[in-house]
Amino acid sequence: NGEVSAIFSNIDGIQDNKFSGPHPSGNVGVQIHHIDPIAKGDIVWTVSPYGVAQIGKLFSKGIYDASKLVAVAGSEVQEPQYYKTFIGASINKLVDGNLKQDHVRFISGNVLTGEKIDKDGYLGFYDNLLTVIPEGDQPEFLGWIKPQKERLSFHRAWGLFSFLNGKNKEYALDSNTNGEARAFVQTGTFEQVTPMDIYPTYLIKAIMAEDYDNMEALGIFEVIEEDLALCEFIDVSKHDIQHIVRDGLELLQNG
């Protein structure tokens, strides 16, 4: 917003870059790619505005500020809201009495990159969001074969008539993957959700084949898990794309 922009515009010694658009335009990896792509041997440090404030308070006042503002949201939260709490706080009190049902999935972070936690679990160190969605372990008659429009489908296979709802339709998605891992099917859709000058399909296949040369040539140094999270979400082959990316990065680091 304007207030935030004014804060950053008044800081000396920085380069102010603005980005807009749908996810993943807010990912730092995508932004770095368009400002100054990472090459082999480069070291890039990133820090959030919240982290800057923590560091500033530590050095200016000698105080480590462990407080954080946490958003509790998701389709199964009755009243989504913000809570002021501390790093490592249990989520139990954040959701007590504020759920639409008990059979839910708690996620530390967002639905694309977050981690499953229990109701008596804790938010991750870097997470400022607790997401609550339906668990999604209930069997459904005919599954994805059943024509319907109440299911989101990027490929118009599951939820065949979902396009009739228009682009602004909101869906209450659950944790069901609607299938198991299968052969890698190339559909050309990964490139549609990756706003970077790379070929994610071929990069992922190079990682799976442990082909170091092609991994480097296809842009492994420019991505981390969150940058290809949408690829995992729309993958008809049901592969754990983010885990594959992490394996590739560790292969290069340890290789």
Language-model features: locations:
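Buried, small/hydrophobic-residue-enriched core segments of structured protein domains
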Residues: 1-255
